[in-house]
Swiss-Prot record:
CDD domains: cytochrome_b_C, Cytochrome_b_N. It is a multi-pass membrane protein. One of its GO terms (cellular component) is mitochondrial inner membrane. It comes from Akodon lindberghi (Lindbergh's grass mouse). The lineage of its organism: Eukaryota, Metazoa, Chordata, Craniata, Vertebrata. This is Cytochrome b. Keywords: Electron transport, Heme, Iron, Membrane, Metal-binding, Mitochondrion, Mitochondrion inner membrane, Respiratory chain, Transmembrane, Transmembrane helix, Transport, Ubiquinone. Heme 1 (or BL or b562) is low-potential and absorbs at about 562 nm, and heme 2 (or BH or b566) is high-potential and absorbs at about 566 nm. Belongs to the cytochrome b family. Component of the ubiquinol-cytochrome c reductase complex (complex III or cytochrome b-c1 complex) that is part of the mitochondrial respiratory chain. The b-c1 complex mediates electron transfer from ubiquinol to cytochrome c. Contributes to the generation of a proton gradient across the mitochondrial membrane that is then used for ATP synthesis. One of its GO terms (biological process) is mitochondrial electron transport, ubiquinol to cytochrome c. GO terms for molecular function: metal ion binding; ubiquinol-cytochrome-c reductase activity. The chain crosses the membrane at residues 33-53, 77-98, 113-133, 178-198, 226-246, 288-308, 320-340, 347-367. It comes from the Eukaryota.
Amino acid sequence: MKILRKNHPLLKIVNHSFIDLPTPSNISSWWNFGSLLGMCLVIQILTGLFLAMHYTSDTATAFSSVAHICRDVNYGWLIRYLHANGASMFFICLFIHVGRGIYYGSYVLSETWNIGIILLLTTMATAFVGYVLPWGQMSFWGATVITNLLSAIPYIGSTLVEWIWGGFSVDKATLTRFFAFHFILPFIIAAFALVHLLFLHETGSNNPSGLNSDSDKIPFHPYYTIKDLLGIFLLLLVLMTLALFFPDVLGDPDNFTPANPLNTPAHIKPEWYFLFAYAILRSIPNKLGGVLALVLSILILAAFPLLNTSKQHGLIFRPVTQTIYWIFIANLLVLTWIGGQPVEYPFTTIGQIASITYFTIIIILIPVSNTIENNIIKL
């Protein structure tokens, strides 16, 4: 078996990626989230496949087909709630994974980092089109509001929106194409994930100390396979608890009402994992400015390798930047809270302050703290 996995053309690739892969001996549980994201993707593809067998992408029957899945299909309710809450688990793991990358300076592996940003954007696009499919009130109005933002693009905006809608409003054509996108995008995510791994294994993994670990590496299996299995079991425990005991806690009550173009919900808002970006969008009174800020709130992650001037790797020995990092995390939580609140005082003011803080920390405070710490080292 050992000879086979080392010499077989296909097994050799698996062997170099998951069995004999030289891994730093000191990586902590924060490094588990990569494998958890892989697990989440598998769960989402499998549950999504079974849901697609019973779902109909037609405005007249989409809502009732979801109700049919929950009521008449064997364990349909479980598959549906695993898929819906699986998306939330996916984004929790995704945000922790990105947060760990920032904290431990993994962005210096620029190819891996940039593919990761593409993965984040693709996952967000997949989640957005997926949220439209149940064709509830928030699905319909969320799709209308978010796609309508493209009309802010000069010259081609209005044409682009009508092209995406497939008409003059969100309707049957929109739902059909969103279903097609939602079906194909997870497989594109899987392909990007393989490229992400390919780039990671070219350079080797980062580690908590931020030091070169070439002299102290251990095989991935059995040490980290067992460690990852523990993480997977804990993830499944949380996911099953959510799906079985609190299935609708992360959803929106408006989505229990079929889509009605004549009745606008009091507060249109996306799923919780988009609220931070939605808060940034709403903080700018100008439509085009808001759209640019929304896009930049994600794309600014690509600036981390460019703005990095520190002589140390990661934040473990950098108390000044560490403090700024935790302020940044707290600020993100404030933005998430504000995104779910109505557009009125004091929420708008808090949102504007938090949005300015978000960009200020990344563009100004972190590079300045890097310079301060570099000068402290020289003393």
